[in-house]
Amino acid sequence: MIFDKDNYEEYDREVWEAIHAEEKRQQNNIELIASENVVSKAVMKAQGSILTNKYAEGYPGRRYYGGTDYVDVVESLAIERAKKLFGAKYANVQPHSGSQANAAAYMALIKPGDTVMGLDLAAGGHLTHGSPVSFSGQTYNFIAYNVDPETEVLNYEQILKQAEEVQPKLIVAGASAYSHIIDFKKFRDIADQVGAKLMVDMAHIAGLVAAGLHPNPLPYAHITTTTTHKTLRGPRGGLVLTNDEDLAKKINSAIFPGLQGGPLEHIVAAKAITFKENLDPAFKVYAQKIIENCQAMVEVFNAHEKFRVVSGASENHLFLVDVTQVVENGKVAQNILDDVHITLNKNSIPFEKLSPFKTSGIRIGTAAVTARGFGPEECRKVAELIVKTLENTENEAVLEEVRQEVKLLTDAFPLYENLV
C-alpha cells in the first residue's frame, strides 16, 4: 500500500533529490538572509511527527473534534511557555504565519477603512504594514511614516507630528529591515496622545526581546505579533500576544474561525520546543553573539568607502548596505554573491530610487551563521569576502578564490549530518 512507503528516497526520487540538494546548499552556503535561521533537530523532528495527522479546530478544552487530549497538552505547553518567555498574560500559538498573526491583530483592533500608520516599506517596514499589494493596504487606509532623511533612524517627534495630522486609529511599530532599537514606550506615548491603539510586530527581533537584549513591547503594545522563526530559531509560524483579556478573546475569534480552520499541531509542537529552548540561559548567550557578529560585519563595511551602511550602525541582528557604488544594484549583488555561495537578499533602502525588483541595497543578518557557530572573526571574514566579490565581479580567478574560502568556513562549521 502507498502509505506503507517509509523510504521516500526510493519511492519518490524526484522529491528526495530536491531536498537532498537543498541540504547540500545549506551546508555549503553561508546564510545571511536576516529572516532565516537554523532550527534544532528537536524542532525539525516535531514538525515531522504524528501530530500532522490530527485535526483540532478550536482551542484546548474547546475543540470541535474528539481525540484531542494530547494535542491539547502540546498546545497548552506552547501557550504557557510563550507567555512566560515574553511576560504576556495571553498567547495564541495557532497562526500559520506572521502575516496571519498581523491580520488577526488588525481584525481585533480596527475596522476596514480605518486609518493606520506603519513604517514605509523602503525604510524597513513590511508588506503587511500597509503595502498596496498586501491585504493590509487594500483593507485599511495605511499612511506611511518614515525615518529621518539625515540619520536614517526613527524620528519620534516627526512621527508624533504626523500622527496628530492624520489621526490614525492604530499605529504599527516594528520592521523587517531596521537596524536600531525601537522605543516602544515613545510609540505608546504617541498613540495615547492621538487616541490610537499600538500594535507591535516584533517578528525580526523577537529572539533578542526574549533574551532581554531589546526592550520588550508587551508593557506598551495593545497587541504584539511575531513569527517563530527568524531570531527565535523555531519553525515557520506566527504568534500573537496581549495583556488585555478582551483583546485576547477578539484575537482568538479572529484566528479561529475568522482566518483559519484547524491549527497545524505538529508546528505548534515545534513552537513549544522552540520556546523551551528560548527559555534556556544558553539562548541569551546565542542572542548576544548574534549582535556581536552583526556589529563585527558592520565595522568591516564602514572601513570600505564604497560600501555605505544605512544609518552607519546596527543594534540588532541585521543591517543594510548601499552597494550602488560598486555594482549596478542590489539584485546584481545578490546574484553574484549567490554564485560564490554567499546567500543574502537585495533590499530597498530609505528613500529608495530603484524598483523593489532591483533595489540599491542588500540586507545582511547574522542569526543563521551564529547558530552555525560563527563568531566575530568568521563574520569579519565573510564581510571581507563580500567586499572582495563585489569589487571583482568580472574576475573569475578572484571569484574562485572566494568560493574556496567560503568552503573552508562551511567545512569548519558543519550544519547537519545525514538528515535526508
From Swiss-Prot:
Domain of life of the source: Bacteria
GO molecular-function terms, A-Z: glycine hydroxymethyltransferase activity; pyridoxal phosphate binding
Main location: cytoplasm
Organism: Streptococcus mutans serotype c (strain ATCC 700610 / UA159)
Required cofactor names: pyridoxal 5'-phosphate
Subunit structure as annotated in this protein's UniProt entry: Homodimer.
GO biological process: glycine biosynthetic process from serine; tetrahydrofolate interconversion
Disulfide bonds: none
Top-level class of the enzyme under EC nomenclature: transferase
Identification of the protein by name: Serine hydroxymethyltransferase
Entry-linked PROSITE patterns: SHMT (PS00096)
